[in-house]
Regions:
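Transmembrane signal-anchor/signal-peptide helices with a preference for the extracytoplasmic
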Residues: 17-43
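Post-signal peptide N-terminal segment of secreted/secretory-pathway proteins
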Residues: 64-140
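Membrane-proximal N-terminal amphipathic helix
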Residues: 36-69
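Long, compositionally biased low-complexity segments
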Residues: 121-418
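Glycine-centered recognition micro-motifs in short, flexible terminal segments and loops
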Residues: 1-15
Length: 418
């Protein structure tokens, strides 16, 4: 009997032990599940926050470009025959448009349902669909120059994201810094100083530091000429001929100019611009457009400068006005904006005088004035120079460049101006 009682006690003890282990295991499993759930919600919260910041940055960049369009429309369109008027404080005007969609308190139609405040509300609604309550307060919003082709928009935000299940919460105050490209937008300086008729789209020059190239140095004469070149000794009429030897070639003066290595036995007097260089055909193997400066003894490639000027591309400028300055109708970079960036914020383009002429509105084209935009539109009149080759372009031979702010060196035309 004692053995039976002892056996019963042992069985009860084993049963209780097993039961306890099962309870403990279930408790541990439940606790681990809870930990995993919390970890998942925290990770979801962090991912939500990162995605929210990305969305705020993207929306801020899109909205800023729309705000610039609204501001531009107010400085480019005249009313009742009056010339357009510049803005007073361009940075503050853009900040108002971005945040509230108004200009001096007046709603701008283009900003309807497109303000930063509106999109913040939309983002808050989207986070709720993912199980989070978010609250975003805009403390401040600033617009500054970043460099010559970008603006910097800084939105200081209070962000609170709360898990709707009460598991996790995040509270932060951050600055969303959005760098906004100006490319593809219109330059306000053009309409402001052409009674609203002129325009120019901002496109960064692809030729920075590579406007002209010196290809050959040699002996020559007979002034200079610009035109298409050729290595074809059978068809060089009205072209710049590049050849190794003049022997046997007739009608040399039918060419625009001649670049050759050896005169050979040809005794025909050359009346067109020419240059002699013993490696000419090697150094110029193809047939680009060339500026042959016979009297200067040099051959240049200047097509980059020509294309740049024809398209009125934009270049960084130490003294030219920034985009914000241009919205205010200024001809130089103001200290209030220059002090806000460590980069060059001024810009300049070459005015396409032919485009101004055909814009209409009886706008007077200043043929002898420099093509540098902020000087061209101003009352400043520094000495302006012609550039060899560009004075022979058809139909616009009126390209001029001043040497204010070192423009001759900047555009590599020091040996080409006169």
């Amino acid at each position: 009997m004692r053995k039976g009682v002892m056996f019963s006690f042992i069985m009860i003890f084993i049963t209780l032990s097993v039961f306890s282990l099962i309870v403990i295991q279930n408790s541990l499993i439940s606790h681990r599940r809870e930990e995993i759930f919390i970890e998942m919600r925290v990770n979801s919260l962090e991912n939500m926050y990162e995605g929210l910041i990305d969305d705020l940055d993207k929306s801020l960049r899109i909205i800023t470009r729309r705000a610039i369009l609204a501001a531009f429309s107010n400085v480019s369109v005249s009313e009742a025959g009056e010339p357009p008027e510049p803005l007073d404080e361009a940075n503050e005007t853009l900040a108002e448009l971005i945040r509230y969609g108004t200009l001096d308190g007046t709603p701008e139609p283009i900003m309807e349902n497109a303000t930063f405040t509106y999109w913040v509300g939309k983002i808050e609604d989207l986070t709720l669909l993912k199980g989070f309550d978010s609250y975003i307060d805009i403390n401040s919003l600033e617009v500054k120059p970043y460099d010559y082709i970008h603006l910097l928009v800084i939105a200081r935000l209070n962000i609170s994201i709360i898990d709707t299940q009460g598991v996790a919460e995040l509270n932060r105050t951050i600055d969303v810094n959005s760098i906004v490209s100006l490319e593809g937008l219109e330059d306000p300086l053009y309409p402001l100083y052409t009674s609203g008729f002129g325009d120019n789209m901002i496109r960064a020059s692809p030729y920075l530091g590579n406007y002209t190239q010196l290809l050959l140095i040699g002996n020559g004469d007979n002034s200079y000429v610009y035109g298409e070149s050729t290595h074809d000794t059978g068809d060089f009429s009205d072209k710049i001929l590049i050849t190794s030897d003049l022997t046997g070639l007739g009608a040399l003066n039918d060419a625009k100019g001649i670049i050759f290595e050896l005169e050979g036995t040809n005794l025909t007097p050359i009346n067109v611009p020419y240059l002699i260089n013993l490696t000419a055909t090697t150094l110029i193997p193809n047939s680009p457009n060339l500026l042959l400066d016979g009297s200067g003894g040099k051959v240049w490639f200047i097509d980059n400068l020509i294309i740049d000027s024809e398209n009125s591309y934009y270049h960084p400028s130490e003294n030219g006005p920034s985009y914000l300055d241009r919205l205010e109708g200024k001809f130089t970079t103001q200290n209030k904006y220059k002090s806000q960036s460590d980069y060059t914020i001024g810009m300049e383009s070459f005015v396409n005088k032919l485009a101004i002429y055909f814009a209409g509105g009886n706008v007077t084209v200043q043929e002898e004035k420099t093509n540098i935009d902020y000087i061209y539109f101003s009352t400043d009149s520094p000495v302006s120079y012609k550039v060899k080759g560009m004075d022979q372009l058809d139909p616009d031979p009126y390209f001029r460049i001043d040497n204010q702010d070192g423009h001759h060196v900047k555009y590599n035309v020091s040996n080409l101006v006169y």
